[in-house]
Design a protein with these regions (language model features):
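A short acidic, Gly/Pro-enriched loop at the edge of an enzyme's catalytic core
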Residues: 62-71
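Conserved SAM-binding loop of SAM-dependent methyltransferases across substrates and taxa
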Residues: 20-31
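Conserved SAM-binding loop
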Residues: 47-48
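A short glycine-rich, Lys/Arg-flanked "PGG" loop and its adjoining helix->strand segment in the class I
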Residues: 86-98
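Conserved class I S-adenosyl-L-methionine
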Residues: 9-17
Length: 193
């Protein structure tokens, strides 16, 4: 993502949905001025300790007032929900300085499956991104274009992501005794297997 951003040292980067601050940490190490937004107080507390040199905030992306050289959003778009796609892209458009670049990483669904998919609620919409919606590539491009944004490139990493999911499962199973001790039951365990 940093390579695709083509950011230079000391440029400003807004991260919409900074999560546990993995990207922010790398970006700060590269000399970028990072502002990260999250809606999770727990994530914010963790991230602020992990990356004290980043400006991390408990803030909704829609409340962004500043402009940035670049914007990054990593697997947050899926949680936005289709009715909010115009607001999401409008916020990116108004928050980018002229000539700025945004990199949005999103899980997508095939174009030929999108029309049927959007009629119902699947596992991801029910349990992972409640109220969210995976975009198809063409739906993503169209929503961005309506707000004056242009998609200049795409990168698919399905095989890499399959490995990521496999590693998450191994880590989940290894930590299951600790997770269970927090009060989560076998139904929860099966849900994420």
């Amino acid at each position: 993502i940093l390579r695709r951003l083509k950011a230079e040292s000391a440029e400003s980067v807004l991260e919409i949905g900074c999560g546990w601050s993995g990207f922010a940490e790398l970006a700060v190490e590269e000399g970028l001025k990072v502002t990260g937004l999250t809606l999770s107080p727990a994530q914010l507390a963790w991230a602020q300790k992990r990356v004290p040199d980043a400006d991390l905030r408990l803030q909704d992306y829609r409340d962004t007032k500043e402009q940035f050289d670049h914007i990054v959003s990593i697997e947050m778009f899926e949680a936005v929900g289709e009715r909010w796609w115009p607001t999401y892209f409008k916020t990116i458009a108004k928050s980018l300085k002229p000539g700025g670049r945004a990199v949005v990483q999103s899980i997508t669904i095939r174009d030929d499956l999108f029309a049927e998919y959007r009629k119902g609620t699947d596992f991801i919409q029910q349990y992972v991104f409640p109220g969210g919606m995976l975009p198809s590539r063409s739906a993503f491009r169209a929503a961005a274009a309506k707000q004056g944004l242009t998609v200049h490139g795409e990168y698919a990493f399905g095989e890499d992501y399959a490995r990521t999911l496999a590693e998450w499962r191994v880590a989940f199973e290894a930590k299951w005794p600790e997770i269970a001790a927090l009060g989560f039951d076998e139904n929860f365990r099966r849900l994420w297997r």
